[in-house]
């Protein structure tokens, strides 16, 4: 699954550490999500969307390759 977490996080003026703390996850988890190495759980995806003020489908996209 592809995502725009990194771009949206930067637009919001947040560091990876800030986002991780607010979501209750490690910085490594944020890095993995941003680099498409880890697909978050539905709960975490919803928390990310809420934090960024967006819908989940505005952040995460199916990779149709």
Identify the residue ranges that each predicted region occupies.
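Short basic helix-loop element that most often maps to the first helix and adjoining turn
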Residues: 4-22
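Short, Lys/Arg-enriched C-terminal cap helix and immediately downstream tail that follows
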Residues: 8, 42-43
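Residue cluster at the C-terminal edge of the helix-turn-helix DNA-binding motif
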Residues: 22, 51-52
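Hydrophobic micro-packing sites on short alpha-helices
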Residues: 45-49, 59
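Key DNA-contact positions within bacterial/archaeal DNA-binding proteins
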Residues: 17, 28, 57
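Short, charged recognition helix plus adjacent turn
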Residues: 61-65
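Recognition helix of helix-turn-helix/homeodomain-like DNA-binding domains
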Residues: 25-38
């Amino acid at each position: 699954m592809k995502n725009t977490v990194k771009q949206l996080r930067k637009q919001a003026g947040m560091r990876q550490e800030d986002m991780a703390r607010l979501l209750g996850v490690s910085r490594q988890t944020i890095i993995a999500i941003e680099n498409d190495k880890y697909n978050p759980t539905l709960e975490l995806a919803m928390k990310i969307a809420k934090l960024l003020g967006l819908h989940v489908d505005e952040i995460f996209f199916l990779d149709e390759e």
